[in-house]
Amino acid sequence: MACILKRKSVIAVSFIAAFLFLLVVRLVNEVNFPLLLNCFGQPGTKWIPFSYTYRRPLRTHYGYINVKTQEPLQLDCDLCAIVSNSGQMVGQKVGNEIDRSSCIWRMNNAPTKGYEEDVGRMTMIRVVSHTSVPLLLKNPDYFFKEANTTIYVIWGPFRNMRKDGNGIVYNMLKKTVGIYPNAQIYVTTEKRMSYCDGVFKKETGKDRVQSGSYLSTGWFTFLLAMDACYGIHVYGMINDTYCKTEGYRKVPYHYYEQGRDECDEYFLHEHAPYGGHRFITEKKVFAKWAKKHRIIFTHPNWTLS
């Protein structure tokens, strides 16, 4: 009898130990292992967590409304790649790695043609500023015909996005979906815009309007991506201290055009009394979010203290 009880105890302990081991493996796999891979020079996009083997239902994002159908955005991604427009992307040769991500995010009018080796070919979501819509319309066939599987999320102030016929940007978008009926164009609601302003104030302690600044497209991209993505890999984005680092890599502000040095642009906007983007301040916030969410930054790598 004693032997039987001893054997049952051993089996019970073994079962509990095996269960705890599997639980730990799952947690390490889904939360920390992509970061470990990145530390050892392995791209996190190659790691597929256990939970990726099934598809979750699409999430509904009520702050983004389809121009044609007036339906809210439905989007749910596993591992997202957010590709920066920065000149840091030049020569990185991570295009194939980026294209293996389940959802690939780009911003404004950043092209892929001619830059595939560095930034990839595919685009699933493109977040666009109201000021960049005219840039898309300079090459509408490329953005809305050839790339008609891309979801476009447009953000802008109410005066430009109003639907009563007086919203100049909204009118452009409405005309575009008339010409390209398969284009998937969503606009950010006024309520969502206010929410994004509120997040800025909460994170920085500053009122966005009173501080004389505008949120960047990167800010709107992050807020949607954190709602839609299981994990996020950001390519080519510099952190808030990069431009003060000795011997930093000097690159153009955009990878696809010659222009002002990236760091010069950052400093100009950060200290502009009115009408600037607080790029450096935003990067501090992104680093804070990365400690709470599954977000990694590479090319260059970020060290999160």
Swiss-Prot record:
<feature type="disulfide bond">
    <location>
        <begin position="80"/>
        <end position="229"/>
    </location>
</feature>
<keyword id="KW-1133">Transmembrane helix</keyword>
<keyword id="KW-0333">Golgi apparatus</keyword>
<keyword id="KW-0443">Lipid metabolism</keyword>
<dbReference type="InterPro" id="IPR001675">
    <property type="entry name" value="Glyco_trans_29"/>
</dbReference>
<protein>
    <recommendedName>
        <fullName>Alpha-N-acetylgalactosaminide alpha-2,6-sialyltransferase 3</fullName>
        <ecNumber>2.4.3.7</ecNumber>
    </recommendedName>
</protein>
<keyword id="KW-0328">Glycosyltransferase</keyword>
<keyword id="KW-0812">Transmembrane</keyword>
<dbReference type="GO" id="GO:0001665">
    <property type="term" value="F:alpha-N-acetylgalactosaminide alpha-2,6-sialyltransferase activity"/>
</dbReference>
<keyword id="KW-0735">Signal-anchor</keyword>
<feature type="topological domain" description="Lumenal">
    <location>
        <begin position="29"/>
        <end position="305"/>
    </location>
</feature>
<dbReference type="GO" id="GO:0019082">
    <property type="term" value="P:viral protein processing"/>
</dbReference>
<feature type="glycosylation site" description="N-linked (GlcNAc...) asparagine">
    <location>
        <position position="301"/>
    </location>
</feature>
<feature type="transmembrane region" description="Helical; Signal-anchor for type II membrane protein">
    <location>
        <begin position="9"/>
        <end position="28"/>
    </location>
</feature>
<feature type="glycosylation site" description="N-linked (GlcNAc...) asparagine">
    <location>
        <position position="148"/>
    </location>
</feature>
<dbReference type="GO" id="GO:0009100">
    <property type="term" value="P:glycoprotein metabolic process"/>
</dbReference>
<keyword id="KW-1015">Disulfide bond</keyword>
<dbReference type="GO" id="GO:0006677">
    <property type="term" value="P:glycosylceramide metabolic process"/>
</dbReference>
<dbReference type="InterPro" id="IPR038578">
    <property type="entry name" value="GT29-like_sf"/>
</dbReference>
<dbReference type="GO" id="GO:0047290">
    <property type="term" value="F:alpha-N-acetylneuraminyl-2,3-beta-galactosyl-1,3-N-acetyl-galactosaminide 6-alpha-sialyltransferase activity"/>
</dbReference>
<dbReference type="GO" id="GO:0006687">
    <property type="term" value="P:glycosphingolipid metabolic process"/>
</dbReference>
<dbReference type="GO" id="GO:0009311">
    <property type="term" value="P:oligosaccharide metabolic process"/>
</dbReference>
<dbReference type="Pfam" id="PF00777">
    <property type="entry name" value="Glyco_transf_29"/>
</dbReference>
<dbReference type="GO" id="GO:0006486">
    <property type="term" value="P:protein glycosylation"/>
</dbReference>
<feature type="glycosylation site" description="N-linked (GlcNAc...) asparagine">
    <location>
        <position position="239"/>
    </location>
</feature>
<dbReference type="GO" id="GO:0001574">
    <property type="term" value="P:ganglioside biosynthetic process"/>
</dbReference>
<keyword id="KW-0472">Membrane</keyword>
<comment type="pathway">
    <text>Glycolipid biosynthesis.</text>
</comment>
<comment type="pathway">
    <text>Protein modification; protein glycosylation.</text>
</comment>
<dbReference type="GO" id="GO:0005654">
    <property type="term" value="C:nucleoplasm"/>
</dbReference>
<keyword id="KW-0730">Sialic acid</keyword>
<keyword id="KW-0808">Transferase</keyword>
<comment type="function">
    <text>Transfers the sialyl group (N-acetyl-alpha-neuraminyl or NeuAc) from CMP-NeuAc to the GalNAc residue on the NeuAc-alpha-2,3-Gal-beta-1,3-GalNAc sequence of glycoproteins and glycolipids forming an alpha-2,6-linkage. Produces branched type disialyl structures by transfer of a sialyl group onto a GalNAc residue inside the backbone core chains. ST6GalNAcIII prefers glycolipids to glycoproteins, predominantly catalyzing the biosynthesis of ganglioside GD1alpha from GM1b.</text>
</comment>
<keyword id="KW-0325">Glycoprotein</keyword>
<comment type="similarity">
    <text>Belongs to the glycosyltransferase 29 family.</text>
</comment>
<dbReference type="GO" id="GO:0008373">
    <property type="term" value="F:sialyltransferase activity"/>
</dbReference>
<dbReference type="GO" id="GO:0000139">
    <property type="term" value="C:Golgi membrane"/>
</dbReference>
<feature type="topological domain" description="Cytoplasmic">
    <location>
        <begin position="1"/>
        <end position="8"/>
    </location>
</feature>
